[in-house]
């Protein structure tokens, strides 16, 4: 996609998908998430690459946002009013819009202290969460548009993320205007090196978008026709969901490259991915499929619709697709 304005073209294609409130159906198992989305329920915008960047405000980079976004003076925080309008349009069509924090270029390393972590969560909430009249001076990239939550995607060592994530959850719970979601995108080796602190530290996630690619546990090592899988380790993540997670109802999503060029390894064709979906559906924690990313899926024919069809056939619901245009780390 050449411009973030085209988020609306994805929605037009996928408007036929029926969802529960705000797109993400936490109890369901047919969600499709895409980094942005079509035949899709959840759209994480990737990425916020800094929580406290130049000027003391967050920094966002959507890679190919182009002319519609201009930085606020003295900062690297982009003002993207068109994206704000698109967010509201997507939400009216039942899509869940998340902001993904981190990615391959995130280099802050987390926070120096728990107090800094809480302050960072408050800053993100003021910047992207509900509009408060008491915070009229806050710079808001999407103007009065309010995202539906945050996705945490850290690919290097980060500190004090438990108090950060818990503060986000506290802010969610105190806000009664709508439901907000907290998700994460760990790599498939368990325990994930960079997210272990959060995953095993009492943070209540609504869904985990497991990256089953670029690793030995990737989708390319799924054995067709086998009832047990030695390398593809969805079963291990299902065990985490039921026995370790602070939220025993957390949904585990199968993360897949949306095209051959989307990841270094792990891409499988739609027919094979359907087999993975059918096998994964036997686990109660299964929540759907995540694809990286929208631009790759868009160029891959009927890949997304085939996946959505497989999910819908068994009353599985979420497809999550991310939009970033380009991300060297995936």
Curated annotation (Swiss-Prot):
For this chain, one GO molecular function annotation is:
chitin binding
GO biological process terms, semicolon-separated? chitin catabolic process; polysaccharide catabolic process
UniProt cross-references to SUPFAM superfamilies, sorted A to Z: (Trans)glycosidases (SSF51445)
- Its domain of life reads Eukaryota
Q: What is its EC number?
A: 3.2.1.14
Q: Report any Pfam family annotated for this entry.
A: Glyco_hydro_18
Q: Which residues form the signal peptide?
A: 1-22
**Domain GH18: residue ranges:** 23-314
Entry GO CC: extracellular region
Please list the reactions this protein catalyses.
Random endo-hydrolysis of N-acetyl-beta-D-glucosaminide (1->4)-beta-linkages in chitin and chitodextrins
Glycan-bearing residues: 61, 135, 278, 302
What this chain does, per the record? Secreted chitinase involved in the degradation of chitin, a component of the cell walls of fungi and exoskeletal elements of some animals (including worms and arthropods). Plays a morphogenetic role during apical growth, cell division and differentiation (cell wall morphogenesis).
Q: What is this protein called?
A: Class III chitinase ARB_03514
Naturally occurring in which organism (per UniProt):
Arthroderma benhamiae (strain ATCC MYA-4681 / CBS 112371) (Trichophyton mentagrophytes)
